[in-house]
Amino acid sequence: MKQTVLKNNLQNLLESAENILLLQGPVGDFFLRLADWLTANGKTVHKFNFNAGDDYFYPPTQAHTVVFNDNYDAFPEFLQEYITQHHIQAVVCFGDTRPYHVIAKRIANENQASFWAFEEGYFRPYYITLEKDGVNAFSPLPRRADFFLEQFPKLAQQEYKAPTPVHGGFTPMAKNAIRYYIELFRNLRKYPDYIHHRAPNAGHYLKPWSLSILKRLNYYIEDIQIAKRVEAGKYGKFFIVPLQVFNDSQVRIHCDFPSVRSFLLHVLSSFAEHAPADTNIIIKHHPMDRGFIDYWRDIKRFIKEHPELKGRVIYVHDVPLPVFLRHGLGMVTINSTSGLSGLIHNMPVKVLGRAYYDIPGITDQNTLAEFWNHPTPPDKELFHAYRMYHLNVTQINGNFYSQVFFPNKNTSDSSTPTT
């Protein structure tokens, strides 16, 4: 009997719907390129624009593009009627926690339309994510080891193969974001009732991003020196704690800590009380947060209150994460994708929030107090099955802000990409 081969979710979306509605995408023209690909494959693509930033990257002159500039309370009924009138079979968005997208998921489910969410890549770099019914901790995938082991024989690609590199990093995203927010702010009158998931003022971002560049230059030499010390074993046995963006939905929605700061202080308190005296802890600032927030004062204050930690807490900014993953004892995270990077390096990972990869056999399931003393690495066979499932099904080679590889027209072979 021939084994069923699992398809990538982009192919599953293509094969499951004729009339597809796009909501908000990532900043930039990715949704316009997605629409072109869907249209080339015979689909009818509809699009809702919610602000002038959307208009700039997906012009309202495009076929079946609708400007929604009514108030937020009117959106459920508007969407309900549109889905019914145009026989929408799939609703697609970027991020499933934005106000309009939360409503869209409910309305889609009530009308037997599938709901698909794009997200930044689970496995980075060079990947983006597409899941049905939700992403991150809202992913519907089972949190059971047996599921991924059972699915492994159905995967077309069972051995890891490096993805095609694409241009990424901060610059292409920042360029798209600056243009998006400039347009959004310049044309607020067209969308007076629009509710944004972040600060809509372009000036809110320009100053921090400028400060971020200056800080990057300031930390450059120090970061190089820290990386050399790590490689030389100067920090001895250490744990790595990668911080997340202060206003990330992963923090706001998928964990019980009120802030990244509260998470940091909780981890430091546990480390001070339970970690072996011969271990250190390295706190890694998130590069996207460089111009917005700094935790050095909090760390210094904590060390002053816990003098036994003097010389054992290291705060770093732009040292590449793999430097720490190659040498650390383990990682503590809220639910960052950095956890997956740690697991790839066979590093024990302790998750303190809700994460799609927090699965027995993959992440450490003991308490944080126990983790400091007995960190448990992932089961290699299980994690390989987990990783390959995602690379086959939920991950797409590319970067939202530069280039994404779409399957060739009219083919079910999603391993043969075109741009």
Curated annotation (Swiss-Prot):
Pfam families: Capsule_synth (PF05159). It comes from Neisseria meningitidis serogroup A / serotype 4A (strain DSM 15465 / Z2491). It is found in: Cell inner membrane. The gene is lipB. The keyword DNA damage does not apply. This is Capsule polysaccharide modification protein LipB. GO terms for biological process: polysaccharide biosynthetic process; polysaccharide transport. Keywords: Cell inner membrane, Cell membrane, Membrane, Polysaccharide transport, Sugar transport, Transport. Involved in the phospholipid modification of the capsular polysaccharide, a strong requirement for its translocation to the cell surface.
